[in-house]
Amino acid sequence: MPNILHPFIIIMTLLVVATGNQASIDKTTQWPRMKPTKKPPPRDEGPSKLGSISTTVSPTAIGITEEVTDAMMDAYTITSTGSTTFSSDTYSADYHTEAMVPPGVGPGNYTLDYNECFFNFCECCPPERGPPGPVGEKGLPGIPGGKGEMGPPGPPGQEGLTGAPGTHGVKGEKGDTGASGLPGIPGVTGKQGEKGESGPKGDKGDTGFPGLKGDPGERGEPGWNGTKGGMGEPGKQGLTGPPGPDGIKGEKGDKGDCPFGEKGQKGSIGEPGPQGPKGDPGVPGTNGTDGLPGSKGPKGDPGPLSKQGEPGPPGPQGPPGQRGMPGMKGTRGLKGARGIRGFKGFKGEPAVQKRSAFSVGLFPSRSFPPPGLPIRFDKIIYNEEAHWDPNASKFNCTHGGVYVFSYYITVRNRPLRAALVVNGIRKLRTRDSLYGQDIDQASNMAVLRLSSGDQVWLETLRDWNGVYSSSEDDSTFSGFLLYADATKD
């Protein structure tokens, strides 16, 4: 766009210069410098008619700004131009001065350009309003003005949107303690706190009242079988149990002798029985003579049975007769019901616990013992019952029973053959075939029944006697009573 305007501006400049030169040629005389015209009266006085002369107050006395421009030169090079600028507030609103005002611009400061009006009117006459000129082209942008004064504060704006929450600030210092407020409403009971650490032990308190009887504790684990105690004193006889059911009827025993007892006393006369029925009359016989009594005839046949009368009341009991012979033993009856448990008997005497144990070791000076002899275990680890004889290096059995024996032997430089001996009989053997500077362990364990007076020891066989001991390696021999034999009281 600026490239297109450049030729147009150059052409317009040439036309203006040519027109100016022609106008200067037409002028015959040179006008002198123009003096400022008399100013119109102030707005409180009425406007004067054109052509009349009136006396006016100097513009400087009433705040009129007068400016004479000498440097401004128009296109006429021969004559100088002069202009006078007055404030529009000096003149009445009815005074028309729009002749020199550009179109679209309101009343304000105006300038009289005498170069364009000297052909039409004199300098002393105010110009008349002419027809509006054509709209001029848009001028170049003006120089940016200076910064204006700060205007009055505007009305408060609308409330802005809520901003995003800010970050947590640094914790401030602890403030002063405020005044105590009114007591608040009691809060809800909080949860039980965690158990605190144990505090220091307090002083012993006074003896309290005896507490209530506690609940019975849980049943303990069954204890080991103890040795049988001595027989306690017999308890009191328990209550008689209920009679058992009748046993099975035994077989009939042999008939016992029935000797006659002494005659009892005569019983009292019983009451007469009822009268029997009347019999049929017999056939009358003839009158015979009395004969001699004959011999007793045989017993006749029993007559017909008659109905037995009702028995009379029993008579008084007679004296007891003699005891008859015992009959045969009957079969065993059924088992009766269990009787009521008797009272607890008195506590018996406590049994004496029998103890026997030992544990011995080998000193380094006793390494590689001679074969066929008891190994010299002189290092006593446990021998409170003194059942181990360190002089003979043997265990003496004091209480008969079951024993447990074990040995742990360090083997070095030589092979080993060891045996557990009971009364000269080798009960247990161990072998370790080792040569050189290597170190090994040989061990064994056995459960044996011993009687009082038996002896037990450990020995090596032939030249296999690699039993070794040092400050860092031990060889030990141990035994203990598992349980003793029962003793008869």
UniProtKB/Swiss-Prot annotation:
Matches recorded under SUPFAM superfamilies: TNF-like (SSF49842)
Example of a GO cellular component annotation carried by this entry: extracellular space
Keyword Signal carried by entry: yes
Gene Ontology BP terms: biomineral tissue development; otolith development; otolith mineralization; protein complex oligomerization
Molecular function as annotated in GO: calcium ion binding; extracellular matrix structural constituent conferring tensile strength
Residues in Collagen-like domain copies: 145-204, 205-255, 264-323
Pfam families in the cross-refs: C1q, Collagen
SMART domains per record: C1Q (SM00110)
Entry-listed glycosylation sites: 109, 225, 287, 391, 396
Subcellular location, record wording: Secreted, Extracellular space, Extracellular matrix
Composition skew (Low complexity), residue ranges: 290-310
Region (Disordered): 27-57, 133-335
Biased composition (Basic and acidic residues): 192-206, 248-257
Signal peptide start and end residues: 1-23
UniProt keyword Repeat present: yes
Keywords assigned: Calcium, Collagen, Disulfide bond, Extracellular matrix, Glycoprotein, Metal-binding, Repeat, Secreted, Signal
Domain C1q: 351-488
Gly residues bias: start-end ranges: 142-151, 226-235
Role, per record: Collagen-like protein, which provides an organic scaffold for otoliths onto the sensory epithelium of the inner ear. Acts as a scaffold for biomineralization by sequestering calcium.
PANTHER family: COLLAGEN IV NC1 DOMAIN-CONTAINING PROTEIN (PTHR15427:SF33), EMILIN ELASTIN MICROFIBRIL INTERFACE-LOCATED PROTEIN ELASTIN MICROFIBRIL INTERFACER (PTHR15427)
UniProt note: domains: The C1q domain mediates calcium-binding.
Assembly, per entry: Homooligomer; disulfide-linked; probably forms homotrimers. Interacts with otomp.
Family: Belongs to the OTOL1 family.
Name of the protein this chain belongs to: Otolin-1-A
Organism whose genome encodes this protein: Danio rerio (Zebrafish)
Chain's gene name: otol1a
